[in-house]
Amino acid sequence: MADGKIKSGAQLAPNKTLDAALEAIVNSAAQPLSSLSVLAVKAGKTVYHKQFGAKWIDVTNPANNKPADAATMYRIASISKLVTTLGVMKLVETGKLNLDEDVSKYLGYTLRNPHFADTPITLRQMLSHTSSLRDDGGYYWEASLKLGLRDVLLPGGVGYGKGAMWARNAKPGVYFQYANLPWGVIGSVMESVTGERFDRLMRRLVLDPMALPGGFHPADLSDADLANVATLYRKRTEVNGKEVWNSSGPWIPQVDDHSKQRPAPRALPDYKISTNGTLFGPQGNCRLSAAGLAEIMLMLMNDGVHRGKVILKPATVAEMLREQWRHNGKGEKVAGGSNGDPNGEADFGSARRLMNAWGLGNQHFLDITGAGNGDRLVRAGGYRAYGHLGDAWGLKSAMVFNPFSRDGMIYLIGGHGVDPETTPGEYSGMYRHEEKILDALYTLAVNPAQ
């Protein structure tokens, strides 16, 4: 079972060596970070939990900066997909959803890739990024646009355009391409079968039963919880549509700066349930702390049990973590026999070979290594894991764990002072500072050999 409430750094044995290593990473001239929250689990117990930097920065008077702490929540970006999957699997358990059913049944209209009109699209495909949906036509439509997903996804719809959201070269179920759009469809499906708005449904199914503050809709957070949400930063502006980084310049807020006013609601009062599942960001809009992610990690390690309460059945967790796709090593071209693109172009750059195997809403890290490419998590190798990465608005994040050794690591980076593309990894497709964070956590806190 989990070791009770996640402990803050002050409640754990001191680890000054790791403190110093992470402090040096955060304050590095090569890649300064606005804030960092980390957590390490060893043999099923939290052994390290620490924060560095500021969750909110006053560029005119640093004395007013608000330091990140154990309660600080971040917009966790694509780790949200793993959280959303927990909600899907709860609905599968109750019989409201079937992973292999044609999702048209749930949506109320026929959803097909028009280039492969005879092939149904399923939740299993969408959760494993093999649905043939692509991000090229967009993946979020704000409420003011008054568009439903059917207006975007169906030929002839007012938002369909040139149909860039559909793959032309691979039918559903056969080719992996990391994408965000399927998660908007998943959100609509979840709303359709429950009659509940996605963000509130996720609170009922997952966050409230686990007593986790945060959620997918900041406008609904209490003032106290909202004050715990970190602002994400970059030292970057745009000039004529091009990024301009200035490492000696000020930290520029990117998202979640609520210092002057509360966030606006994402849905209009007349929102019709299930019409636009992208509104609340099932793919990336969840706010959680490192401690909150650790509760989820430990629940999955414990076969679905969280502090004595069954969140998911053991068989459900096993199915969620079971491998659904693995790259066949034949590059990324369908014509060359490839079964997927391991480069993760939608969110994670290109030519980085970062994605090599997938479960349902979770990545499988196979310890593949190369200079600036691969999914290796620690320099010495040998650590395979499940989990997810995140990358958006200056944040980079990771939640990775091995349920067999019961070890895991979490980091949430609140902002970058230098373009991460200038600091590629030495032995993986992650950036160099991400490698350093994970390697420090592993060697100085997690290493099972210690």
Where are these regions (language model features)?
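Short, conserved catalytic-motif segment at the N-terminal edge
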Residues: 12-74, 165-166
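Short, hydrophobic/aromatic-rich segments at coil-to-beta transitions
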Residues: 379-387
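A short, polar/charged loop-to-alpha-helix boundary motif
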Residues: 56-68, 420-433
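Short, surface-exposed loop or secondary-structure junction motifs
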Residues: 56, 114-379
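Short, surface-exposed coil-to-beta transition loops
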Residues: 281, 393-397
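Active-site SXXK
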Residues: 19-25, 38, 44, 75-100, ...
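Short, well-ordered beta-strand elements
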Residues: 396-402, 406-423
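Short, well-structured active-site flanking segments
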Residues: 47, 63, 69-71, 83, ...
